Amino acid sequence: MRIRRTFALGASVLVLLGACSTGGGSTSAPSVTTSAVPSVAPSTAPSVVPSVAPSAAASTGGASASDPTIKVGSDGFYEAKLMAEIYAQALEAAGYKVDRTAIGIGARKVSAPALESGQFDLKPEYIGSGLAYYQSGAQTGDPAANQKALQAILTGKGGGITVLDYSPAADQNAFVVRKDTADQQKLATMSDLAAVQSQLKIGVATDCSTNPVCGAALKTAYGIDVSNATKLAACDTPMVQALKGKTIDVGELCSTQPDIAVNGWVVLTDDKATQPAENIAPLVRNDLLGKLADKTGFEAILNAVSAAMDTATLTDLGKQVSVDNKDIAVVAKAWLQSKGIVK
């Protein structure tokens, strides 16, 4: 599911389509009002991730003259376009020709059918939301399970689509605290929060009490009671302002939200995996893979990129694009160079 994120930057407003789910609502997201140097939050991605070394992108695979142009697409919001551009540049560095026409083609209801029909060959996907698109409620907090279930569905779509390795990077619902609160209360995980919940003011989504992955999940897994919590739109300006203004001590945001990096807030690890895992993975049409001279090398390039990305880094890169207004291609290249994936 996608929610709308609105970043208010001075007099201008950028409306961007966000990646995480808040249980069915469509809300606006945070207003970034400070230019402080970002202090990125720890990754909330699950620990089971692919282990392909980043250097594989440079050392494994390479295009053949017979290989077709790779048509790369993505959903329409900045983070999806950024990941698509990163994958595109990594492929170009290995000699593949890339067509970017479909990057930013639209929301999943547009991009998924477009991939199935062959309008493009490759897109980054949030595996929890991708699974929910085809089978509502099937997504879990286990990225491996989400990947497997999504693959089972996509095998029968569009002549077959392959879900490659998922990244440690994930954009999903997360509970966030100010750094001073984290330090004072020694908070790193949701289990830590549970132990001191009576001492803190918690802000949750407006539908948290009736949302099974919010109120019920927090109560069952952690014993956290949100019945008296402050109800605000998750991933939205009021939640951000309440956390900044200390009206609340804990707020529900999206894990790659630029406000986290801008304010140096701390994402509490969902150590019991109550939230649907939204790790990013490339989806590739099987008919394209069948035309490549080195299918294994091609996949290794994409898997290496995915393995090198994490949630904290994606948050910072997203801030550079959506808050600092840096060009997506420039941000993508700088990160790929920092990892030795491109020169």
Regions found by a protein language model. Name each.
Residues I127-Q139, N146-A152, A242-L268:
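A ligand-binding cleft/hinge motif common to bilobed small-molecule-binding domains
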Residues E85-A90, K109-F120, A216-A221, C235-G251:
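Short helices/loops that flank or line small-molecule/ion binding pockets
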Residues L16-A19:
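C-terminal motif of bacterial Sec signal peptides marking the signal peptidase cleavage site
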Residues S21-G24:
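Bacterial signal peptide processing site
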Residues P143-I202, A307-T311:
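A conserved helix-loop-strand patch within extracytoplasmic ligand-binding domains
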Residues N173-D183, N279-D294:
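A bilobed periplasmic-binding-protein/Venus flytrap-type ligand-binding module shared by bacterial periplasmic
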Residues Y78, R100-P113, N228-Q241:
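Short helix-initiation/N-cap motifs at beta->coil->alpha
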Residues S66-E79, Y96-I103, S198-V204:
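Short, well-ordered beta-strand elements
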